[in-house]
Amino acid sequence: MSDKYYRSTYVNVDLNAIVANFQVFQKLHPNKTVMPVVKANGYGLGSIKVARQLMDNGAEFFAVATLDEAIELRMHGIDAKILVLGVIPTEHINKAIQHRVAITVPSKSWLVEAVKEIPESNEKDLWIHVKLDTGMGRLGMKTAEEYKEVIELINGHSHLIFEGVFTHFACADEPGDSMNRQQTMFEEIVGQADKPDYIHSQNSAGALMKDTQFCNAVRVGISLYGYYPSAYVKSNVKVHLKPSAQWISEIVQTKLLHAGESVSYGSVYTADEKTKIGVIPVGYADGYPRMMKGFSVNVNGKQCEVIGKVCMDQTIIKIPDEIQVGDKVIIMDHHSDTPQSAEALAHQQQTINYEVLCRLSRRLPRVYHSSKDLEIRNELLK
């Protein structure tokens, strides 16, 4: 066990795979800026390490969800461009200016209030990306009239820079014409005013499924980490992505249950014969939810069923006789075609692979593998 963490479970993160996925999108869109999305702690895998690795391999512009996430990147030496995709409370707009962070303008009314917060003595620029709602029904303005009014406000302020405009696809990972309709609406609105430096509409699914000459940037989130946005996308593209995360643990205790004996809370599992069980130091506080009961983990190449209720910190599995304390357990595999893939876990949890990754708790150490070195990051002991 490493002296940088003191429990028998961790997440392997393959930084080489993440770089390879980034380069896949660079080849798919050779004349566009590929914007890695490192929000939610880099989809659970570590935004700082991911951003540094990608900067070393040519990334120039990152996207996050919140101003706090952007400032965290700045505090750790990430000096590339950063766009906050979410709405910043207007009273904190000067923090964005201070940290050289581009912000999203969702409406004219928001911008009017934000400008009031900028002191007349300010001499630094604020980069702005205007958000258009073309069908997601979430953030953004819906009309060309409001869009043009916002641009007029931006151009009327000496330190506001109209750097970008973007939208977000609602159904790019599903069959149908929704994405094309949204793209058409986006182009119609954007075409009614001067174009900024960055025009972007494609998320991971959009970037895999569609090319558009109208845009000059793509935002890549889930697929940066090696995961397809949906089974539909995976089956309809000829692009190979490399999953980058593997969740490892080990058996910390074994014991025999006799017929009639039960395990875990509620005693919902009762042995009907003599049964060997193993305990894994992983639970729902780590991102392995209670609904994983009945699923399996991989122990020495054998599929072992999760029995009883998953606890906060521990999980119990049924094991064959040869399994012993210290044997390696694969909770989530870094191969897409195995029973422990992120997609298989998502199916069991009735969710999507995005959420499986984002659920990975900060108390799980991350072990980063790259062509240069191996580095351990423990958020609890940093």
From Swiss-Prot:
Recorded GO molecular functions are: alanine racemase activity; pyridoxal phosphate binding
Q: Which reaction does it catalyse?
A: L-alanine = D-alanine
Q: Where is the active site?
A: 39 (proton acceptor), 265 (proton acceptor)
Pfam families listed in its UniProt record:
Ala_racemase_C (PF00842), Ala_racemase_N (PF01168)
**GO CC field:** cytosol
Post-translational modification N6-(pyridoxal phosphate)lysine, affected residues: 39
Q: What class does this enzyme belong to in the EC scheme?
A: isomerase
Which cofactors does the annotated protein need, by name?
A: pyridoxal 5'-phosphate
Q: What is its EC number?
A: 5.1.1.1
Q: In which pathway does it act?
A: Amino-acid biosynthesis; D-alanine biosynthesis; D-alanine from L-alanine: step 1/1
Recorded hits in HAMAP family, A to Z, give: Ala_racemase
User: Which PANTHER family does the entry mention?
Assistant: ALANINE RACEMASE, ALANINE RACEMASE, CATABOLIC-RELATED
Q: What is this protein called?
A: Alanine racemase
Q: Which organism is it from?
A: Staphylococcus saprophyticus subsp. saprophyticus (strain ATCC 15305 / DSM 20229 / NCIMB 8711 / NCTC 7292 / S-41)
Q: Which gene encodes it?
A: alr
